[in-house]
Design a protein with these regions (language model features):
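N-terminal glycine-/serine-/threonine-rich beta1-alpha1-beta2 phosphate-ribose binding loop
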Residues: 1-95
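Generic secondary-structure signature for well-ordered alpha-helical cores
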Residues: 23-27, 120-124, 144-151
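Short, surface-exposed amphipathic charged segments that create phosphate/polyanion-binding patches used
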Residues: 56-57, 141-144
Length: 157
């Protein structure tokens, strides 16, 4: 079975929630997409910081280039917040044909059109969801948004 490789940008309250939700819904995601979901990288500001969840099985990095240069990453999930440098990271992710899911309202308020146009040009998905309940909508974006669109799931197969 193929893997769906994910990079998570941020491991605060929402990012920790995303990790928990992905772990709790791993089988549902696998059944829906017929792929094993793997959190391959997690970008954090400080890899030595104590975390509220067990992250021993995950690769933490402070270097965005590890994610951008990893051709195996299918989806970048951004929950760091802020506009700069986040918008640059999302633009570069889209340019490298990585699907993007974000919960960043501030960034979208300023750069939504730019990111949507870039996603369309690259043939990848840009999904945005509110971060209610620490990440639940992220699973909806993975299951429904990427699975329901032939155009976008072809890149995941």
């Amino acid at each position: 079975m193929k893997e769906l490789n994910v990079a998570l940008l941020g491991l605060g309250t929402v990012g920790s929630g995303v990790v928990k939700i992905i772990e709790e819904n791993r089988q549902q995601i696998k059944d829906t997409l017929n792929k094993d979901i793997v959190i391959k990288h997690i970008l954090v500001r400080d890899t030595t910081k104590k975390r509220p969840i067990n992250i021993s099985q995950y690769h933490l990095t402070e270097d965005i280039n590890e994610i951008l240069n990893d051709d195996d990453i299918d989806i970048v999930i951004e929950v760091m917040g802020g506009i700069e440098p986040t918008v640059d990271w999302l633009r570069e992710s889209l340019k490298r044909k990585k699907h993007v899911i974000t919960a960043n309202k501030d960034l979208l308020a300023v750069h939504l059109e730019l990111l949507e146009n870039l996603a369309e040009q690259q043939g990848v998905a840009l999904k945005f969801e509110a971060s209610v309940a620490g990440g639940i909508p992220i699973v909806n974006a993975i299951n429904n948004g990427l699975n329901r669109s032939e155009e976008h799931t072809s890149a995941l197969q």
